[in-house]
Amino acid sequence: MTRPILIKNAEVFAPEKLGRRDIFIAGGRIVAMEESLEGLSVPGLETIDACGAIVTPGLIDQHIHVTGGGGEGGWKSRCPELVFSELVKAGVTSFLGVSGTDSMSRSIENLLAKVRGLKQEGASGWMWTSNYSYPVTTITDSVKTELFAIPEVLGVKIALGDHRCSFPSMEEVRSIVADVRVAGMLTGKTGFVHVHLGDYTSSFDIFDGIVASGLPIKHIRPTHVARHPAVFERAMGFAKQGGWIDITTGGGNYMGCAADAYDMAVENGVPVNRITMSSDGHGSMPRFNEAGEMVGLGVGSIMCNIETVQELARRHDLTTALLPMTRTVAEALTLEGKGVIEVGADADLLILNAEHEITDVFMGGVQCMRAGEVIVKGAFEE
């Protein structure tokens, strides 16, 4: 049972600016929010005075290699696993775990176990089954069964247009989308195909063919959309047709940073409610030469999410900055109670200072960071 908490005098961005509010959280949810909850009497109530501070929804990151990505540079290039305190420090209260290039030593069973472990430690977590390989890699040997039987699975990941993918045909990808759609109908999950994009625009030819055949565009979710000029041009067109596109905050955007990609998309007519962002955290950040040979490798951080929020807030306003990693992604993935501050929503909250730096984090009503210090850590963290 979580301890009831009253956050007073906060400037609330829900993500829309609401002004000064008191927020009462109990049982992991937001129970009340008013201009003043003075006089509230609840046994065991803890009161936090947030005067001068900002309260926002926790961030949602739909693309973290929680078991570690990488491997493209040989045995020593396998990226390390994520630990719980990294989520806390980055203000990521909800995440989707994902696998990548390595379909040999990174099993989907291990991914599921890691997601469930992070959930036990306090975060909200889901996952994409499979990886870059085709045929898809699943626990149950069926995409439909995967969504039907495993609550954490919201869809399947594939890779297209990348020299590391299996180059499935349009018909093969369409079959995956069809299976995901049916499974989504049966489970109420919607069902998505989360698509790692490489540098080749052929991916969007496949998407166009699938949509033309009658399958709804909402099931196709491309990520890393700003990695190449031609790919981004096609991605913007895809979004203007009603699709969602996901910009990577952790780098790999040809025009600069994720905020640059966001601005370019909006300037080119992409609706803001069709743009999400994710970190690609703990994935490898390989650098290849023109011959396709890897010449360098790094590990993606999830701190790039809050850094992107800060940059977008400098350019625009805090509501604009928060949307791609709060309300928009929650609505895109049909995550009820996530990405918003309203009565009945999950108590996943951040307290920010005037510079939009994270000082306090709440996951499901549990305070995990206080005054910049992580106070709830993972099972094996000191």
What are these regions, as identified by a protein language model?
Residues 1-5, 11-56:
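Histidine-rich, glycine-flanked metal-binding segment
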Residues 10, 28, 52, 63, ...:
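Divalent metal-coordination and catalytic microenvironments
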Residues 10, 30, 331, 341-382:
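C-terminal cap of metal-dependent C-N hydrolases
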Residues 43-51, 142-147, 258-271:
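Short amphipathic alpha-helices and their capping/turn segments at secondary-structure boundaries
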Residues 45, 50-113:
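Metal-associated gating/positioning segment near the N- to mid-region
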Residues 82-135, 150-166, 185-199, 218-223:
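Divalent metal-dependent hydrolysis catalytic cores, especially in the metallo-beta-lactamase
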Residues 164, 172, 179-288, 294-299:
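Active-site core of metal-dependent hydrolases
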Residues 267-351:
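His/Asp/Glu-enriched, well-ordered alpha-helical/loop segment
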